[in-house]
């Protein structure tokens, strides 16, 4: 009897066993966690803060809301949401990577943000919450690292409350050819060098560049969100499409 072929997926440009991807992504983020915030500022020239500000402005978050900041890493979005939901609300910073959670927890504690934030290690494909739990779910620069994106989107849909929204902030496809070529040169030449100099890890930043190119484009992700059940799904290109902010609702 022949064995069932092993399912494969991509890890950057490499083809790997589906069951191996999560641990390989974990190794990347264990490696970069300590320098993650510094590298974000360097890589984006600080523009990531504007992208996140736009995400917060699109969130509709109010006092008393329950928010899941999925793949929340070092907690930039969680910090702001904690202030917006107030004492009667709750923010959960969720991440599959323990090193990223540790850095995020320490950073937010140092900012004095305690009381309405919980930290949970979780897999986006099987979120450990009851149905209809959250008013808002955000996933910023995390979806491209998920092995089964469709499964993760269905899991997010399940735990959103009716009327709740999902915001996906992610690298995407530049709108113009000239920008795309310049972005490719930067990503594949300068980014790994920066990673080597600052984080002593060029390979992780090579993976970062490759994972961005393998991520679904704007319209494909919009369709994936609709297929998962989301309605009124739209996206907004930021910085010429280098990043896109997708939004969908559950009714």
UniProtKB/Swiss-Prot annotation:
Q: Which SUPFAM superfamilies match?
A: S-adenosyl-L-methionine-dependent methyltransferases
Pathway named in the protein's UniProt entry: Quinol/quinone metabolism; menaquinone biosynthesis; menaquinol from 1,4-dihydroxy-2-naphthoate: step 2/2; Cofactor biosynthesis; ubiquinone biosynthesis
Biological role: Methyltransferase required for the conversion of demethylmenaquinol (DMKH2) to menaquinol (MKH2) and the conversion of 2-polyprenyl-6-methoxy-1,4-benzoquinol (DDMQH2) to 2-polyprenyl-3-methyl-6-methoxy-1,4-benzoquinol (DMQH2).
| UniProt keyword Coiled coil present | no
Q: Which residues form a coiled coil?
A: none
* Biological processes, Gene Ontology terms: aerobic respiration; menaquinone biosynthetic process; methylation
Indicate the family of this protein: Belongs to the class I-like SAM-binding methyltransferase superfamily. MenG/UbiE family.
**Which reaction does this enzyme catalyse, per its entry?**
a 2-demethylmenaquinol + S-adenosyl-L-methionine = a menaquinol + S-adenosyl-L-homocysteine + H(+); a 2-methoxy-6-(all-trans-polyprenyl)benzene-1,4-diol + S-adenosyl-L-methionine = a 5-methoxy-2-methyl-3-(all-trans-polyprenyl)benzene-1,4-diol + S-adenosyl-L-homocysteine + H(+)
Query: Its encoding gene is what?
Result: ubiE
Cysteine-cysteine disulfides: none
Enzyme nomenclature, EC number? 2.1.1.163, 2.1.1.201
- The answer to whether the entry has keyword Cell inner membrane is no
InterPro entries xref list: SAM-dependent_MTases_sf, UbiE/COQ5_MeTrFase, UbiE/COQ5_MeTrFase_CS
Q: What is this protein called?
A: Ubiquinone/menaquinone biosynthesis C-methyltransferase UbiE
A Pfam short name? Ubie_methyltran
Please give the Gene Ontology molecular function terms for this protein. 2-methoxy-6-polyprenyl-1,4-benzoquinol methyltransferase activity; demethylmenaquinone methyltransferase activity
Q: What class of enzyme is it?
A: transferase
Q: Which UniProt keywords apply?
A: Menaquinone biosynthesis, Methyltransferase, S-adenosyl-L-methionine, Transferase, Ubiquinone biosynthesis
* Annotated binding of S-adenosyl-L-methionine, by residue: 74, 95, 123-124
